[in-house]
Amino acid sequence: MPIITDFKAIATGLFVTWKHIFRRSVTVEYPEVKRTPAPRYRARIVLTRDPEGGERCVACYLCSAACPVDCISMEATEDGNGRRYARWFRINFSRCIFCGLCAEACPTLAIQMTPDYEICERDIMELVYEKEDLLIDGCGKDPAYNFYRHAGIGVTQPRGAGEREEEPVDARGLMP
């Protein structure tokens, strides 16, 4: 009876083949047809600007500290007004795992993730992006965000002298 079981196995295989031969193909012809990623898809990292056109990055090193694979490096410096900025900013995309922790850690929304997933190069050194490669002209996902307009500037006034700031509490005056 092995001939009958062999024939049954072949017939089952042919039936499955004929059943699937007229269905729509699941394969996407990638270079010609590009799939649209999900709305919250995280891929290429960019550095955004504030609404005035200046850099949002204040070189706080939080993104570098949050990165689990240590692919972000930078050097901080100050301009003439005392505002901190990154003299150079570098991301090694050959090491990046696109987890998004750097974008979550950034207090000024300078680092944002885009859905651009076509990052491939023949030379691995071309995957190391400098600040000039990462900076975009726009404000990113939240164009009205300008909360940290004065981030990185040292406080020159005494406590309680700023706008909408209350006088500090004298703890010794509260003691019995």
Swiss-Prot record:
This protein's cofactor list reads: [4Fe-4S] cluster
What this protein is called in its record is NADH-quinone oxidoreductase subunit I 1
Q: Where does [4Fe-4S] cluster 1 bind?
A: 57, 60, 63, 106
User: Assembly and partners?
Assistant: NDH-1 is composed of 14 different subunits. Subunits NuoA, H, J, K, L, M, N constitute the membrane sector of the complex.
Identify the residues that the record assigns to the 4Fe-4S ferredoxin-type domain, covering every copy: 45-77, 87-116
Q: Which gene encodes it?
A: nuoI1
Which species does the entry assign this protein to? Geobacter metallireducens (strain ATCC 53774 / DSM 7210 / GS-15)
Instruction: Kindly give the HAMAP family that the UniProt entry links to this protein.
Output: NDH1_NuoI (MF_01351)
Q: How is the cofactor bound?
A: Binds 2 [4Fe-4S] clusters per subunit.
Q: What does this protein do?
A: NDH-1 shuttles electrons from NADH, via FMN and iron-sulfur (Fe-S) centers, to quinones in the respiratory chain. The immediate electron acceptor for the enzyme in this species is believed to be ubiquinone. Couples the redox reaction to proton translocation (for every two electrons transferred, four hydrogen ions are translocated across the cytoplasmic membrane), and thus conserves the redox energy in a proton gradient.
- What topology in the membrane does the UniProt record assign? Peripheral membrane protein
State where [4Fe-4S] cluster 2 binds.
Answer: 67, 96, 99, 102
